[in-house]
């Protein structure tokens, strides 16, 4: 299943030669930090992915790289143009990016944010992948933390779209991201302890919606 935003313009390679469910060699980044920032492993190291815990931004480059073979369940393709960064990062940099192919595919030993903008998800992940409503701009980010904490693996691949971002009010975006600024780090910690701890972070109506969604896979 592919999830794509309407402001992404696909390249000719979009959706071709997918990596999920195949054994592939990756640029694998090992970190002792609680989370990994995939953008930090590219030629745009000054930026960070939306959802990466801002409390550990100064540690995002503390990684060791090696070549490792993995079998990913999720493939998060990158995006040239306007990247998926948080409002703070966008206010500071206002970047237009061209990510170099040589950095991909890449993966890590730790939880890392991926979005619903240009992502391919295998069948076995679907019952667990849910864009939690009522949590602002963290719906897809917390979905990524949840499935990765359950043990599914993500690989980040080279850009397959150009994002021409729709008009946004960055102050409003930032307000919708505050739930993440405040909770992302602790959520990652708590999901590591017990996957059911997601229920301590999402509203009751989100929890019930997730339960209803999962009934479609029984």
Which residues does each PLM region occupy?
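Short beta-strand-to-loop acidic/aromatic patch adjacent to the donor-nucleotide binding site
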Residues: 1-11
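Short catalytic/ligand-binding loop motif for oxyanion handling, primarily in non-cytosolic enzymes
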Residues: 9-13, 163-166
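Conserved catalytic core of nucleotide-sugar-dependent glycosyltransferases
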Residues: 10-131
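Catalytic activation segment of kinase domains across protein kinase-like and atypical kinase folds
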Residues: 15-30, 167-183
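A short, conserved alpha-helix in the catalytic core of glycosyltransferases
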Residues: 113, 119, 125, 135-152
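Active-site donor/metal-binding and catalytic loop motifs
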Residues: 125-129, 133, 137, 153-177
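Long, compositionally biased intrinsically disordered regions
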Residues: 172-218
């Amino acid at each position: 299943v592919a999830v794509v935003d309407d402001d992404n313009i696909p390249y000719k390679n979009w959706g071709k030669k997918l990596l999920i469910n195949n054994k592939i060699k990756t640029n694998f980044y090992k970190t002792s930090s609680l989370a990994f920032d995939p953008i930090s492993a590219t030629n745009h190291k000054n930026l960070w992915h939306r959802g990466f815990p801002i409390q550990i931004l100064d540690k995002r480059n503390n990684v060791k790289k090696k070549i490792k073979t993995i079998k990913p369940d999720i493939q998060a393709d990158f995006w040239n143009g306007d990247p998926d960064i948080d409002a703070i990062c966008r206010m500071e940099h206002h970047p237009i990016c061209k990510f170099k192919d040589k950095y991909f595919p890449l993966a890590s030993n730790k939880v890392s944010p991926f979005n619903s903008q240009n992502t391919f998800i295998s069948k076995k992940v679907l019952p667990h992948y849910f864009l939690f409503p009522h949590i602002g701009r963290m719906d897809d980010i917390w979905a990524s933390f949840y499935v990765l904490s359950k043990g599914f693996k993500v690989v980040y691949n080279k850009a397959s779209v150009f994002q021409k971002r729709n008009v946004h009010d960055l102050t409003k975006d930032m307000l919708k991201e505050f739930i993440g600024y405040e909770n992302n780090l602790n959520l990652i910690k708590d999901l590591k302890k017990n996957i059911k701890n997601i229920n301590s972070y999402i509203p009751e109506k989100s929890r019930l919606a997730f339960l209803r969604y999962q009934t479609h896979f029984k």
